[in-house]
Every structure is written in C-alpha cells, then in structure tokens.
C-alpha cells in the first residue's frame, strides 16, 4: 500500500528543498518526523507538513498502522518560475528568478 501527499507551488527553491527530502527518504516515519523537527531549514517545515498529511491519509483512508509506515518516496519537482527585475545603474536591470517547488512524499508499509 502506497499513500502520498503533495504540496504544490511551495515558495522555496527546489535545490534547497531537495536537501531536506534526501534526509528523510527511506526512513521510518517516526524517525523522519524527528529529523524534520530538529532541522533548522525552511524546507523542513514544509516537508513536515506534507509528511504529516501523508501519514494522516494512510491512517484515515487506508486504515494503516503508523508504526509500520516508512517513507518510500520523497521528491521535489520544479514548478513555474516567477521572473522579476532588479534595477541597476545606468538604466539597466537584472533578472531575478523566484523558483517554486512541488513537494511530494509517499509513505508505505515496511
């Protein structure tokens, strides 16, 4: 049984969010929740919400036992990019790319 949860259009760079996804992939859910709770990265808070949602989905929709769940997949895809301008000297401008992520966490039986 595989149950997933997704947070689309998260305002964080995929490169930064993937660092946190790599920490919890393959771990059991109790360990993953503790890792995210003690991580000081912004992405860990977003990933924690998605993980808790996936756990709740497994418990309520599938009747799964929380103690037997493990994080089978955790990945971050790139969403649309917001393009902004920063004014520079002599009437020029530089482009700023505000990157957006789609975070997906899948939990399943051990």
Curated annotation (Swiss-Prot):
PROSITE patterns for this protein: RIBOSOMAL_L22
Keyword Cell cycle, does the record have it?
A: no
Q: Which GO terms describe its biological process?
A: translation
Superkingdom: Bacteria
- Functional description taken from the UniProt entry: This protein binds specifically to 23S rRNA; its binding is stimulated by other ribosomal proteins, e.g. L4, L17, and L20. It is important during the early stages of 50S assembly. It makes multiple contacts with different domains of the 23S rRNA in the assembled 50S subunit and ribosome.
HAMAP family in the record: Ribosomal_uL22_B
Assembly and binders: Part of the 50S ribosomal subunit.
Q: Which family is annotated? A: Belongs to the universal ribosomal protein uL22 family.
**NCBIfam families per UniProt:** rplV_bact
- Protein name per Swiss-Prot or TrEMBL: Large ribosomal subunit protein uL22
């Amino acid at each position: 049984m595989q149950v997933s949860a997704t947070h689309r259009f998260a305002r964080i760079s995929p490169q930064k969010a993937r660092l946190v996804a790599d920490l919890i992939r393959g771990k059991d859910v109790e360990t993953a929740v503790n890792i995210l709770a003690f991580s000081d990265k912004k992405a860990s808070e977003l990933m924690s919400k998605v993980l808790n949602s996936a756990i709740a989905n497994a418990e309520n929709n599938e009747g799964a036992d929380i103690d037997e769940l493990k994080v089978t997949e955790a990945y971050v895809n790139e969403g649309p990019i917001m393009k902004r301008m920063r004014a520079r000297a002599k009437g020029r401008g530089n482009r700023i790319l505000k990157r957006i992520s789609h975070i997906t966490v899948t939990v399943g039986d051990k």
